[in-house]
Design a protein with these regions (language model features):
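Extracellular/lumenal and peripheral-membrane lipid-interaction modules
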Residues: 1-137
Length: 137
């Protein structure tokens, strides 16, 4: 059994999983297993999400109202669940804290795992192609 994940699928699930709205989302899946995402987010949405810790929240005041968000993840399927590891996540070129990266990764993976559970699918491995990841069960 196979579960295909396309770049459009990732953009859609990411939009659902994030605790703040994003626009202009672009996703690139590479054969090396990298999932790269760019999106635009407003400073106000980030502030209201409570995802950004105190000191960084102050720094948000100095960013433009509309900010570029970039993230790159790798994926694995330990124990029949999709797990995402954040390689980097940046807002306007500034690296976000590890706790923020982990929270986003966990929310993103949880959304995928819910979808697979709804289809009674348990992944065992991932095959990477340009533009698509194929989970094999």
């Amino acid at each position: 059994m196979e579960f295909h994940i396309t770049e459009d699928d990732i953009a859609s699930v990411l939009t659902e999983a994030l605790p703040f709205p994003v626009e202009d989302t672009a996703v690139k899946i590479s054969r090396d297993g990298t999932i790269a995402v760019t999106a635009a987010v407003t400073r106000q949405a980030l502030t209201e999400s409570n995802l950004v810790p105190g000191k960084l929240r102050t720094a948000l005041l100095f960013l433009p109202e509309r900010c570029k968000l970039y993230g790159a993840w790798s994926a694995a399927v330990p124990n029949g669940k999709l797990s995402l590891t954040c390689r980097t996540i940046k807002l306007e070129g500034f690296t976000l804290p590890e706790q923020t990266a982990q929270a986003l990764s966990d929310a993103f993976a949880a959304q995928w795992n819910t979808r697979m559970e709804q289809r009674d699918f348990t992944p065992q491995t991932i095959q990477w192609q340009d533009g698509e990841a194929v989970l094999l069960g």
